[in-house]
Amino acid sequence: MTRAFLPHIITDDSALGGSVIERSLIFNSSDSTQLENTSLGTSPTSRRICTISVWFQRNEVDEESGLLTHGYSGSGGSASGAPFRFVDSGTRLSIMNDTNNSTDWKVTPSRLLRDSTAWYHLVVAIDTTQGTASNRVKIYYNGVQETDFETANYLSLIHI
């Protein structure tokens, strides 16, 4: 089968044709904008295994901020949840879990995310049933598994 010659302009978003991405969002950090979903229910299919996938593009690289957070504020003002936060002056993404205002586990790849024009595809796979601690949290950027970490305090066995 032959293919007609079609020029391909290589850009950071060439897979998208360099066009506007429909249904994408940009948040103004000074507005404290957020999306909230309260309809997830209280009976997950698994409390031990999950995968989270998201595309994102940085608009403010030099500030520490949250990319994705979930959790709740318990009685007495204690907070629990699993934030994905930009740390180290906003250059690295840290995946962690907090319980009662204390960090249970935290994994921060060494990769710097400083390109405000690039789209990143992040996949985080959590499997607390794995016997080897480093297999319990796996992080992928653009399809490549991260193996070099700034911080690697893995979660304990069956802890979610």
Q: What would you call each of these model-derived segments?
A:
Residues 1-48, 92-94, 98-103:
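Low-complexity, glycine/proline/serine-rich flexible segments
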Residues 31-94, 131-133:
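Extracellular glycan-recognition modules
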Residues 96-120:
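Short, aromatic/His-centered strand-loop micro-motif at the edge of beta-sheets
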Residues 118-128, 139:
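Short tryptophan-centered beta-strand motifs in secreted/extracellular beta-sheet-rich domains
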Residues 150-153:
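Outer-membrane beta-barrel translocator domains and adjoining extracellular loop/strand segments
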Residues 158-160:
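Conserved small/polar residues in nucleotide/adenosyl-binding loops
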